[in-house]
UniProtKB/Swiss-Prot annotation:
Official protein name in the record: Mu-like prophage FluMu tail sheath protein
UniProt organism field: Haemophilus influenzae (strain ATCC 51907 / DSM 11121 / KW20 / Rd)
Entry's family note: Belongs to the myoviridae tail sheath protein family.
Transmembrane annotation, as ranges: none
Known function: Major component of the tail.
Length: 487
């Protein structure tokens, strides 16, 4: 018998017809990958979710129940869903560190209103406005604002008032509370009512982030294509990096890229980034933006991951994040952004509608093992394309040759036999390359064909070894043009 049946035995005498199905040739074309996003963050004690266990989240209302109203995670989910409602979002909640401290800040109002007006106070991008009448004292205005803030259970701070001073305390412990921005009069046209002023003490003294080792345990053996991480302390990043590198490796092949954001001055961000060299981390610098960096990380991941899931090689530049940008005086110019990009930091610009948009999404990888500049893993599109190529190759081999015997090239094989040879595998890889070429992910078939090497292992007759040189399609990023004009 030359045909390799899967279920029909050869020792049959009972009549008559036995037909089986074999799906190894059913699927053609590059495979469709199902992308999963995992969000890390802090839950409150009021949330019903169990810390350390990932849970699928489909809506903001669900997140508030799972992680607590005003929690870091609830607001991160809200931001993510506002930017991407289709990707499969999972959340891995973490308890705050028992030894941690909550960030605090304050707003001190002084003076007495001499004219009616509106007092505007923004907290973490949420604008609280109260009417002021002539003669209102600082204590009266502070009391009005405190009531507004206290009534909002979704703001990440708790507000108390004593006289003319509003004290704000983060709802959760950890360093991320220090990212909560406090400011007055953000929007054009807003101003203090005549006779009133405010002195703001920025949020500070938040300390000790949740235990990242709990998060890593919670990752399990699932394939998380994209991870959103709000914790940027060195210890947490080192633990996460080690796990992501293992996942990227050939034995696990469940790789993922981690998206983060960092608040700080240009010097602070570049100094931070240049201490790292991580090809599976992508960090966006926010500068003095009204919303916390953890919300920027959520929006950044939502728009970039959404694009990469559709086409991993297409550049993500100009993708819009519906966030509040820094004031015009706090926006970085081209030389500053160029420096950020050479420091391993992704950048954004602000469009005509005052919306931040991705300018360049890069990884934090800058140097090779010898400390020399290395652009091999610079762009997130490269990481995403490599991940998909490996998935496509693995899917093709496991789909076409799941239970095949292995023979040398030139072996006489009967029709229908489940036998594969190095040449058959080589031809299958060439066919897959042409499909990926039409999909706009690779180029230069002739070079690939000439350099593709497939052999049967000389020490293990059950193993095939392959060496290939895929030429990845790049992104159109720079257009340079010199005009030599004639008069």
């Amino acid at each position: 018998m030359s045909i390799s049946f899967n279920n029909i035995p050869s020792a049959l005498r009972v009549p008559l017809t036995y037909i089986e199905f074999d799906n190894t040739k059913a699927v053609s074309g590059p495979p469709t990958a199902l992308h999963k996003v995992l969000m890390l963050g802090t839950k409150l004690a009021t949330g019903s979710a169990k810390a350390g266990e990932a849970v699928r989240v489909s809506a903001y209302a669900q997140a508030k129940t799972l992680f607590g109203r005003g929690s870091q995670l609830a607001e991160m989910v809200k931001t993510f869903k506002a930017h991407n409602s289709t990707l499969d979002l999972w959340v891995l909640p973490l308890d705050e560190a028992p030894s941690g401290a909550k960030a605090t800040g304050s707003v001190q109002i002084t003076g007495t209103a001499t004219q009616a007006g509106t007092f505007s106070l923004m907290i973490a991008g949420n604008n609280y406005k109260t009417a002021v009448t002539s003669g209102d004292t600082a204590d009266v205005v502070a009391g009005k604002l405190q009531k507004l803030i206290a009534a909002d259970q979704d703001v990440p701070v708790v507000a108390t008032v004593a006289g003319n001073t509003i004290t704000l305390t983060c709802r959760f412990k950890g360093e991320t509370g220090n990212e909560i921005d406090l400011r007055c009069n953000y929007y054009s046209g807003e101003a203090f009512p005549e006779g009133l002023k405010a002195t703001i003490t920025d949020m500070k003294n938040g300390a000790v982030n949740p235990d990242m080792s709990v998060a890593i345990t919670g990752l399990g053996a699932e394939w998380w294509n994209y991870i959103i991480n709000p914790f940027t302390d060195t210890e947490s990043l080192n633990l996460l990096r080690a796990d992501l590198v293992k996942r990227w490796g050939p034995l696990k092949q469940i790789d993922g890229i981690c998206f983060m954001a960092k608040r700080g001055t240009h010097a602070e961000v570049t100094t931070f980034a240049e201490q790292r060299n991580d090809y599976l981390f992508s960090l966006l610098a926010t500068h003095k933006a009204p919303q916390p960096a953890y919300l920027w990380a959520s929006a950044y991941a939502a728009v970039v991951a959404g694009s990469l899931a559709i086409d991993p090689a297409r550049p993500v530049q100009t993708l819009v994040m519906d966030l509040l940008p820094p004031s015009m005086s706090d926006r970085w110019d081209l030389p500053e952004r160029n420096t950020l990009l050479y420091s391993g930091v992704s950048t954004y610009t602000v469009n005509a509608g005052s919306q931040p948009q991705v300018e360049a999404a890069i990884t934090m990888y800058r140097k090779n093992a010898f400390g020399d500049n290395d652009e091999s893993y610079l762009y997130v599109e490269t990481i995403a394309t490599l991940s998909y190529l490996r998935y496509a190759i693995r899917s093709r081999i496991t789909q076409k040759f799941p239970r095949h015997k292995l023979a040398n090239d030139g072996t006489r094989i009967g029709p229908g036999q489940a036998i594969v040879t190095p040449k058959i595998i080589r031809n299958e890889l060439l066919a897959l390359f042409t499909e990926l070429e039409f999909a706009g992910l690779v180029e230069d078939f002739e070079q690939f064909n000439q350099t593709l090497f497939v052999e049967r292992d000389s020490n293990n007759p059950c193993r095939v070894n392959v060496l290939s040189n895929e030429n990845l399609v790049n992104q159109f990023r720079i257009y340079a043009h010199a005009i030599q004009f004639i008069l």
